[in-house]
């Protein structure tokens, strides 16, 4: 008897998460053209992320950062045999649908681009293509997983070449999971209520302005979901995290990884893989940096290998001191 995965309760979710797990232990590299994509594939990247500018250039250019030109994305798809991902703006359903129609293998609903919606992220369960999303905390990660994200990545601080924020976000998530494992069901439900409250912000603001009563569990607050349904869904995810001792989806490091040692550090902190944005193609020797970072991820627990692949690479990308960035300059604050 042939099984139709679409008819199973978690059929498409299994497919999406399965694709994401296939990238585990690998490096996903940002590329802006077919030539860079070929360099990434040659170096051993498990996938490439197609975008119009690397994060460092997006940060420098300012203005509104949008989805890349579909023609450019198609050229990258045609140039490589590895999976091709692409970024859409937070909450921009139309960009995501366009990318899905284009045939990308995964969509990154990314804070690196200018957000399109300040209230909601995309309901990713309504798409066939899997999504990856950034997170600074367990709350952000769980909300994205509830929405259907098949992969989580640290936000870090993209385009800085400074790994400190990625380290912070990984440690915050790991510590929250540690705390969760000590909680009983009642306390976990309280955490779920707190995490779910972000979905009620639009309805709460409108009701307050109109002088109406506050939002209740039975009120629809996001798409067709009531606040109570969201709380219950997040509660189930938290129980799963408590049982597993980790997120139920793969969790990659991203945002500021610039050297082989940076990549190895994030793997040592528990990352399942690494995204490298500006670190490769803003370095003095992109092909060699790409190969070295792949080697460092594969051998993150072998310091002698990390040291060897780091020799003679030339200058890493110029970095920024994230502590000198204003709140408006911090890309990680985008999203909810």
Swiss-Prot record:
Pathway: Cofactor biosynthesis; pyridoxal 5'-phosphate biosynthesis
Enzyme category, top tier: lyase
Active-site feature positions: 87 (schiff-base intermediate with d-ribose 5-phosphate)
Alphabetical keyword list: Lyase, Pyridoxal phosphate, Schiff base
Family stated for the protein in its record: Belongs to the PdxS/SNZ family.
Annotated GO biological process: amino acid metabolic process; pyridoxal phosphate biosynthetic process; pyridoxine biosynthetic process
PROSITE patterns: PDXS_SNZ_1, PDXS_SNZ_2
Residues reported in the UniProt entry to bind D-ribose 5-phosphate: 30, 159, 256, 277-278
Organism from which the protein derives: Archaeoglobus fulgidus (strain ATCC 49558 / DSM 4304 / JCM 9628 / NBRC 100126 / VC-16)
Subunit structure: In the presence of PdxT, forms a dodecamer of heterodimers.
Signal peptide interval: none
Binding site for D-glyceraldehyde 3-phosphate: 171
EC number(s) per entry: 4.3.3.6
One annotated GO molecular function: pyridoxal 5'-phosphate synthase (glutamine hydrolysing) activity
Function: Catalyzes the formation of pyridoxal 5'-phosphate from ribose 5-phosphate (RBP), glyceraldehyde 3-phosphate (G3P) and ammonia. The ammonia is provided by the PdxT subunit. Can also use ribulose 5-phosphate and dihydroxyacetone phosphate as substrates, resulting from enzyme-catalyzed isomerization of RBP and G3P, respectively.
One Pfam family from the record: SOR_SNZ
Protein name: Pyridoxal 5'-phosphate synthase subunit PdxS
Enzymatic reactions: aldehydo-D-ribose 5-phosphate + D-glyceraldehyde 3-phosphate + L-glutamine = pyridoxal 5'-phosphate + L-glutamate + phosphate + 3 H2O + H(+)
